[in-house]
Amino acid sequence: METVIMITYWDLISHSEMFSDSYMSQEIADGLRLEVEGKIVSRTEGNIFDSLIGGNASAEGPEGKGTESTVITGVDSVMNHHLQETSFTKEAYNKCIKDYMKSIKGKLEEQRPKRVKPFMTGAAEQIKHILANFKNYQKT
């Protein structure tokens, strides 16, 4: 029997699961940033029929009718890892990323002090790149 190992990437600050190695990703700027490929997908949620519900269906409501279904469209890697898309303006993103970078800097000072200066320099360049291309990112 072959053992399969899946690598899961976690956020250092929030400890949220971000994505797994089942998605194509690439390191940018010596690992300062990861880009993860995702596809826009649509999924139907809901649509549970009486035959799948235990108990007395006639006492629960009209017989033979399923619950309402909803079609949800989004990026597969976001939906599969239960992440929430944001709808930042450029200004709101800039404020949020500055606060986040302060948190990252604090973690690095605790755990890898020699990494602080190169990380902060490289991250500033990457943030400039993201802000310059902000219009190209999906906003819901």
Curated annotation (Swiss-Prot):
- Molecular function GO terms recorded: calcium ion binding
Under the heading SUPFAM superfamilies, the entry gives:
Mss4-like
Domain (TCTP) spans 6-140
Cited Pfam families: TCTP
Q: Which InterPro entries match?
A: Mss4-like_sf, Mss4/transl-control_tumour, TCTP, Translation_control_tumour_CS, Translational_control_tumour_p
Give the domain of life: Eukaryota
Q: Which PROSITE patterns does the record associate with it?
A: TCTP_1, TCTP_3
Offer a single GO CC term for the protein.
cytoplasm
Family statement: Belongs to the TCTP family.
Name of the featured protein: TPT1-like protein
- What organism is recorded for this protein? Homo sapiens
